[in-house]
Amino acid sequence: MKKYLTFIFLISFISIEAQDIRIPIDTSVTTNSEVLINNQKITYQAKTGMQPVWNDHGEIIASLYYTYYKRTNIKNSSKRPIIMSFNGGPGSASVWMHIAYTGPKVLRIDDEGYPIQPYGVKDNPNSILDVADIVYVNPVNTGYSRPVVKSGKKLDKSLFFGINADIKYLAGWLNTFISRNNRWQSPKYIIGESYGGTRVMGLAAELQNKQWMYLNGVIMVSPADYKVLRTGSALSSSLNLPYFTAAAWYHKMLPDELQNKDLLEILPLSEEYAINKLIPAMAKGGFISDTERNEVADRMSYFSGIKKDVILQHNLDVPKDYFWKELLRNENGFTIGRLDSRYRGLDKRLAGDSPDYNSEITSWLHSFTPAINYYIREHLKFKTDVTYNVFGPVGPWDNRNDNVREGLRKAMAQNPYLKVLVQSGYYDGATTYFNAKYTMWQTDPSGRMKDRFFFKGYRSGHMMYLRSEDLKKSNDDLRDFIKNSSSNGKSAKY
């Protein structure tokens, strides 16, 4: 298809230094293209480039790389929904959802998500561009985004690399973006994957309270709630059991009574046991009776596919990395993946407490790294010698004062329009689906807003959209959420 290229240089006199290569801090390249989505021809404009981050004194402190897709074969785009998209890490570029989930192009992989050569991209017939425009944002030190440091000064990491600093500067950047692109009338959504779930929970409150930008929806894809994950408590450990069940079922390691049933039939059984029996038992720690300890180990073995004696050796608290090593150890010697436990790996030794590597990451990087570099240069026509950071240096990350869950609750209480969608893969061992459910349940302990929370699960891993069947299903779920979270002319009141 023919593409029309326009260069727009806004404030190109100041530049940032990265790898001793200078990048304009305020520049964009525009191309036009089309894609067939749900058998409907969608024409669109893609604008990609750099937009500055300003501090409270009006000084430029960074420039963020973004890609903005806007449908063009409609009458009025200013009132069309817009989705602001982030990945996680922290330290990850927005590459994953950009060229594998919601964008108009997806990378070339097979139906189960495994890489295919030659690497590249193809049209995405499931993209949500038919119902919403999308901007993919790369935080500082990811993609081509970089800090701007005055000559003779050192980088002040506290401006960017922490849970609250990250939220603050990104909210300001989004305000600028919305103003520049005339999107204040649009219904607004933010979507974040993995740590991006933490990010968008915080952004919902920051945008509303500091930028006066009210959202229609917050979408969390495989969200990481570190307030639970960091505790190492009986609670956080118990929430892993339903994931163990899903992974063991996929690899056919469960007892026949469970293995012969469908996954969605057995997960509620594992969830119920985790909530009603396992959490209370593990809370007793070393004071649990021998009888109860053995009963619990029996049931954990039943639901996890690993041996009772191994569970007892771990005092009922089996780490996930040990599970990835142990599940198939005596079956065929493979390990299973962390972010997607359908993937198998091969270690140097059968012995050990954790896999040598994450088998799914090596597979994904086969595809994503060449695909995004090719796509940006050859399709979007943005060319630079600066390295595209799929994963960038953002440490040490300041995790103090993590109040994002409460921030989301307050934002929802103050904004009757605001709804939340959580999407998780059952085979995700990093940010498990049951942990995501728990986060959703705990966000509003009163239960008075529970009709504004929605959960969707998929037979995939962390990036459920890599599986062809779930790419369609998850995008359709996004469409439904956008439709159902539209105000439809209703007043914002209780």
Task: State where each predicted segment sits.
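N-terminal cap/lid subdomain of alpha/beta-hydrolase-fold enzymes
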Residues: G58-L159, W441
